[in-house]
Amino acid sequence: MKTYLDLLSHVLNKGIDRTDRTGVGTRSVFGYQMRFDLQIGFPLLTTKKLHLRSIIYELLWFLRGDTNVAWLKEHGVSIWDEWADEKGNLGPIYGYQWRSWPASDGRYIDQISRLLTMIKKTPDSRRLIVSAWNPALIEEMALPPCHCFFQFYVADDKLSCQLYQRSADIFLGVPFNIASYALLTMMIAQVSGLKAGDFIHTLGDAHLYSNHFEQARYQLSRIPNALPSMLINPSVTDLFSFKFEDFELLNYEAQPHIKAPVAV
């Protein structure tokens, strides 16, 4: 996936070295955009193997409106464990904001359900938006949303999605985010009777942690393979009815995983 490797190279060669909240230190650029045509293939990195199971289960977890790691752990996914409290709670993070955004009048807004209705009724709307960034609740979240705002666009019977990500850990996090939102776009397109269009990924602070530099250089030495395809069970017409078994990745030829520490 040359588009992603170009990002790695750009940050390594053009980025500014800065301090950060974790104390590790980063090299970063401010403002970067990638575009992936979902008709060409599923944008899952081939220059290192990714754990697709975690990506799919995390997305289904978000769509459930869940904010406790118990369900993830039941399915062998531990990517949120570092931030959970002793009871497994993470506070009002992504799933809560997507499905139960608290309004000032006491209502709870299901942004995802509202989005699905709007795509069908007013596909030309410029308000096909979901936000996870709720300033009133940031302090209650175990980790404020990094991928915080996304918008859909319908044209020529295709559904495209643009994500704004304020904070982008480009070695560990961004490959997951690309695959997750590409898959979400495909799922919403299917249940809306549309084809998947483009996924556009806009990054704010795009950074490499200083203890990921060598891994990034090693990954840049690898040559990408052809993209895989994602087969989604065509019988599913309700977004909230998808199960892990409804997804099948075809022709994924990835090079070995590259280990790197997580900055908490």
Swiss-Prot record:
Cellular localization per UniProt: Cytoplasm
Record InterPro entries: Thymidate_synth/dCMP_Mease, Thymidate_synth/dCMP_Mease_dom, Thymidate_synth/dCMP_Mease_sf, Thymidylate_synthase, Thymidylate_synthase_AS
Database matches in Pfam families: Thymidylat_synt
Class of this enzyme: transferase
GO annotation (BP), single: methylation
Positions bound to (6R)-5,10-methylene-5,6,7,8-tetrahydrofolate: H51, D169, A263
GO CC terms in record: cytosol
Catalytic activity: dUMP + (6R)-5,10-methylene-5,6,7,8-tetrahydrofolate = 7,8-dihydrofolate + dTMP
Binding-site residues for dUMP, renumbered to this chain: R21, R126, R127, R166, S167, A168, D169, N177, H207, L208, Y209
EC number(s) stated in the UniProt entry for this protein: 2.1.1.45
Entry keywords, A to Z: Cytoplasm, Methyltransferase, Nucleotide biosynthesis, Transferase
Pathway: Pyrimidine metabolism; dTTP biosynthesis
GO MF assignments: thymidylate synthase activity
Catalytic center residues: C146
Family in the record: Belongs to the thymidylate synthase family. Bacterial-type ThyA subfamily.
Protein function: Catalyzes the reductive methylation of 2'-deoxyuridine-5'-monophosphate (dUMP) to 2'-deoxythymidine-5'-monophosphate (dTMP) while utilizing 5,10-methylenetetrahydrofolate (mTHF) as the methyl donor and reductant in the reaction, yielding dihydrofolate (DHF) as a by-product. This enzymatic reaction provides an intracellular de novo source of dTMP, an essential precursor for DNA biosynthesis.
Assembly and binders: Homodimer.
Protein name (Swiss-Prot/TrEMBL): Thymidylate synthase
Species per Swiss-Prot/TrEMBL record: Bartonella quintana (strain Toulouse)
Name of the gene this protein is made from: thyA
